[in-house]
């Protein structure tokens, strides 16, 4: 058996994170601390010698990815399927505003991966659009998990909601258990290993969770 290492890095801090405001697919920028966090994460993950870096096109993720690209000399690929969950009517609102307008709705959203805000996506929707990207990378990157340099990871730079949804889908968790994967801090990362035998197809890969919410900087920003 061989293993493909998949690292998923959340973007650095934004002012929306600080203000407990829902971003979704709004194109927000990194804060000054967020840029510092991105550099720190790049320093740690750069030592892993990533095979490639693929990022969401939203600026907070892309700018985080660029720091890792600068550290490793890799050009960052962009894929819109790595965008954060679209939060519909909630985008731009604070947690307090949502709780006042719809008491209990945020709890329902966190506890049910099939639930979506009006006009938005559920975690199941997010996994359905992002999982095919991983399948495409498996098919197109023969060096990933190969015998020569088996531990070089593919790094996806994205968003907390997407990372949780994609991880749950790859791990084939029952949908009712998806909320067990909690929040991630800014510029923190997760690693999954996809165990496979030569000649096997994507559906035969057995993904295992190696690391959840690792960080180059200890912080209390898990939202």
From Swiss-Prot:
Activity regulation info: Progressively inhibited by cobalt ions at concentrations between 10-50 mM and by copper ions at any concentration between 1-50 mM.
Task of the protein: Involved in the biosynthesis of mycobacterial methylglucose lipopolysaccharides (MGLPs). Catalyzes the dephosphorylation of glucosyl-3-phosphoglycerate (GPG) to glucosylglycerate (GG). GPG is the preferred substrate, but GpgP also exhibits low dephosphorylation activity on mannosyl-3-phosphoglycerate (MPG) and mannosylglucosyl-3-phosphoglycerate (MGPG) in vitro. Shows only trace of phosphoglycerate mutase (PGM) activity.
Entry-linked Pfam families: His_Phos_1 (PF00300)
Quaternary structure (record): Homodimer. Dimerization of the enzyme is essential for its dephosphorylation activity.
GO MF terms, alphabetically ordered: mannosyl-3-phosphoglycerate phosphatase activity; phosphatase activity
Enzyme Commission (EC) number: 3.1.3.85, 3.1.3.70
Record organism: Mycobacterium tuberculosis (strain ATCC 25618 / H37Rv)
GO CC annotations on file: cytoplasm
Temperature curve summary: Optimum temperature is 45 degrees Celsius. Is active between 20 and 50 degrees Celsius.
PROSITE patterns hit by this protein: PG_MUTASE
Active site: 11, 84
Domain of life the protein comes from: Bacteria
Similarity comment text for this entry: Belongs to the phosphoglycerate mutase family.
Binding site residues for substrate: 10, 60, 159
PANTHER family: BROAD-SPECIFICITY PHOSPHATASE YOR283W-RELATED, GLUCOSYL-3-PHOSPHOGLYCERATE PHOSPHATASE
Cross-link annotation Isoglutamyl lysine isopeptide (Lys-Gln) (interchain with Q-Cter in protein Pup), location: 47
Key words, A-Z: Hydrolase, Isopeptide bond, Ubl conjugation
Acyltransferase as UniProt keyword: no
Presence of keyword Oxidoreductase: no
A biological process from GO: dephosphorylation
The name this protein goes by in its record: Glucosyl-3-phosphoglycerate phosphatase
pH sensitivity of activity: Optimum pH is 7 (at 37 degrees Celsius). Is active between pH 4.0 and 10.0.
Variant or mutagenesis effect after changing residue 60 to A: Loss of phosphatase activity
Reaction equations catalysed: (2R)-2-O-(alpha-D-glucopyranosyl)-3-phospho-glycerate + H2O = (2R)-2-O-(alpha-D-glucopyranosyl)-glycerate + phosphate; 2-O-(alpha-D-mannosyl)-3-phosphoglycerate + H2O = (2R)-2-O-(alpha-D-mannosyl)-glycerate + phosphate; (2R)-2-O-[alpha-D-mannopyranosyl-(1->2)-alpha-D-glucopyranosyl]-3-phospho-glycerate + H2O = (2R)-2-O-[alpha-D-mannopyranosyl-(1->2)-alpha-D-glucopyranosyl]-glycerate + phosphate
């Amino acid at each position: 058996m061989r293993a493909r290492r998949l690292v998923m890095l959340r973007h650095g801090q934004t002012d929306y994170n600080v203000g407990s405001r829902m971003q979704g697919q709004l194109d927000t920028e990194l804060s000054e601390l967020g840029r510092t966090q991105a550099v720190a994460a790049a320093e740690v993950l750069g030592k892993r010698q990533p095979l490639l870096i693929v990022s969401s096109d939203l600026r907070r993720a892309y700018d985080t990815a660029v720091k890792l690209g600068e550290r490793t000399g890799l050009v960052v690929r962009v894929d819109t399927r790595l965008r954060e969950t679209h939060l519909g009517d909630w985008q731009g609102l604070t947690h307090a505003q949502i709780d006042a307008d719809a008491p209990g709705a945020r709890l329902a959203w966190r506890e049910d991966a099939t639930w979506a805000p009006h006009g938005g996506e559920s975690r199941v929707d997010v996994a359905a659009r992002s999982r095919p990207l991983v399948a495409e990378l498996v098919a197109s990157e023969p060096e990933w998990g190969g015998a020569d340099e088996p531990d070089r990871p593919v790094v996806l730079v994205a968003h907390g909601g997407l990372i949780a949804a994609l991880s749950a889908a790859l791990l084939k968790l029952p949908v009712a258990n998806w909320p067990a994967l909690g929040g991630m801090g800014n510029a923190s990362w997760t690693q999954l290993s996809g165990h496979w035998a030569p000649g096997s197809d994507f559906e035969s890969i057995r993904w295992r969770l190696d690391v959840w919410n690792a960080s180059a900087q200890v912080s209390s920003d898990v939202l």
